[in-house]
Amino acid sequence: GCPVCVTPVGFIDEAIWLALEKGVTICTFGDLVRVPGTKMSLAGAREKGAKIRIVYSPADAEKYASKHPEEQVVFLSVGFETTTPAECLSVKKAKKDGLMNYSLLMANKTMPQAYEALKGSADIFLYPGHVNAITGTELCEKLTEEGVSGVVAGFTAKELLTALAVALVKFQEGKPFFVNCYPRVVKAEGSREAQQLTDEMTKACDSEWRGLGMIPGSGVCLKEDWSAFDARKKYDIPPIQGKANPACRCGDVLQGKCKPSDCKVFGKVCTPQHPVGACMVSNEGACAAYYAYGDNK
């Protein structure tokens, strides 16, 4: 799934507050720049003078901070188990290099609690292959024992179609199942090194998911030993409750409750050029994909 799509409006508002009120330099992946906040996007904040830089990795952000010690640099850390280790590494390097002008604003999430929240409303989980490459498949196998079926899929068209075909055949057998259809990347044990790094530096926290609400224990934040690099603590960010456009059905799309074209703003007010919701921003988003390739035209 796309981490941008489940990132709540309030996170964008926090980043804008840091940029406009504290004058920090925001380093972010490009997809986040156009995601609407309550009043504006990061692109809109940039037009008001905010310093917004697009980077391709947290290492790029840490490197920028090292070259610009006069600036306070905050990296917008979003993603699942796949990206959290790289963000932890950037903090570890910053601490080693004595870079106290670098920190993370974290909206990282973990999948187990999301599976728990959704398992009653799904026939089959199409597990994200790159997440399972880190976490392994133990949880998927455990969920099968609870009656929850699923397959791990890769990301090419052939891999996705293979996983879907396997899922349909197994589903018709009428018994809970789990099949790893991405064995060239996903191993049962996952990546022990990545798991250990994440466990060393982070702890679980409650986290808000766009469309799903607050899911206890589904977020990731830095442990106390690394709290100097936690932007929320460093800048004492006030509680910000973001408000999404009520016409946007991004949350329902994420849960499979409706097609993107069922949303009344889809393809009209909401387009890739002028997105109303996060699902239209990223090329990994369901609405953007449906706009480009669906039967809506």
Feature-to-residue mapping (PLM):
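Metallocofactor- and cofactor-centric catalytic cores in central/energy metabolism, strongly enriched
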Residues: 1-70, 84, 92-97, 103-105, ...
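Conserved mixed alpha/beta catalytic, RNA-binding, or beta-rich assembly cores of soluble enzyme
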Residues: 1-12, 29-32, 52-58, 108-112, ...
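Gly/Ser/Thr-rich loops at beta-strand to alpha-helix junctions
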Residues: 2-7, 31-35, 76-86, 111, ...
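Short beta-strand segments
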Residues: 27-30, 75-78, 105-107, 126-128, ...
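Glycine/charged-rich beta-loop-alpha catalytic/anionic-binding loops adjacent to active sites
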Residues: 69-74, 144-147, 244
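Short amphipathic alpha-helical segments
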Residues: 87-89, 138-139
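A conserved active-site cap/scaffold subdomain adjacent to cofactor or substrate pockets
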Residues: 103, 120-186
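Internal helical hairpin/lid segments
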Residues: 161-252
